[in-house]
Amino acid sequence: MKQGKKFISPGAWFSMVYPADWNEFEDGEGSFLFYNPNEWTGNFRISAYKGSATYGKEAVEQELKENTSATSVKIGPVSCAYSKEMFEEEGVYYTSHLWVTGMGDVAFECSFTVRKGEPVTEAENIIASLEVRRANQKYPAEIIPVRLSEIYQINEAYEWVSNTVKEYLKKDFQGQEEDIANMQQVMDSGNIGAKKKEAWLALGITLCAILANEVEGFEWRTLIDGNREAPVLVNVADGAMIDPMKLVWSKVKAGE
C-alpha cells in the first residue's frame, strides 16, 4: 500500500490519511481541499460539522431521505449516502462524486471532482481512513505535514517581524542570517513587553524560518499536542524537532 500523509483538522475534530503526492490547498472557510499538484487526478474536498451525539448517523439518514439520487454505500467501515452530478467546463466533462457520512457527533460532506470516467479510489481510501477524535480523550502528541493554517501563521509572524525591524531599526529585513542580529536588537530594546506572547512567538517562528532558508534539510511540520496546534521545524534526516515557542517565548516567560 502506498504511504499516505496524515491530516488532523484545526480544532482536532477529525483525522484522515490522504495520498503522499497530494497537498492541501486554499479553499472556502470550513472546507479543506486536497489534490496532486503535479499530476491532477481530482479535487477532494471535505467539510465537517458538529452536532448532537448521534449527529453523524442522522446526517446520512437525512441525505438519503432528502436527496432522491443518493444511495447507501459502505466504504471500508464507513457508511455513506452517495450521489454524483455531471457538469461541463470549457468543453471538458467532469463528474462530482458526493458522499455524506458521519461518526458520533460529527457529520462530513466529501466531494471528489474528476474528469468524467476517471476512478474515485483515492477519495474512497481517504473516506475509509476518517476518524473522529473525541473531545474527552487524550491523544499522544503527533507531528503531521504542515497545514495551511500553520503556513498562514508562519507568514504572519514573518511579516510582523519584518515590519517591526523596519519600524524600530529603519533596516530592511531579508530573512537571512544577518537579520538575526537585528532581531536580537529588537528583543533587547525593551519595546516588546514580557507578557506579549504572540510577539515573542513570532520572533521564534521567524528565527526558524531563517534556519529553514539557510540550512538544507529542515522542513516545517504541524505539531498537534492536546489543545496546542503549532508550526515546528523538523530535521528531515534525524527527525529532531525545533519548537519556535521554546526558542524565545518560553525563556521570556521564565524570566531568562
In which residue ranges do the predicted regions lie?
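Short, hydrophobic/aromatic-rich segments at coil-to-beta transitions
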Residues: 1-6, 31-32, 76-85
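Secretory pathway targeting signatures of secreted, lumenal, and periplasmic proteins
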Residues: 3-62
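Surface-exposed amphipathic alpha-helical segments
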Residues: 22, 108-141
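Short beta-strand
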Residues: 25, 72-74, 221-224
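Amphipathic, interaction-prone secondary-structure segments
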Residues: 30, 189-237
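Signature of long, low-cysteine stretches enriched in small and polar/charged residues
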Residues: 59-107, 111-116
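N-terminal low-complexity, intrinsically disordered segments
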Residues: 140-198
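A recognition module on extended beta-rich or small alphabeta surfaces enriched in W/G with H and D/E
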Residues: 232-256
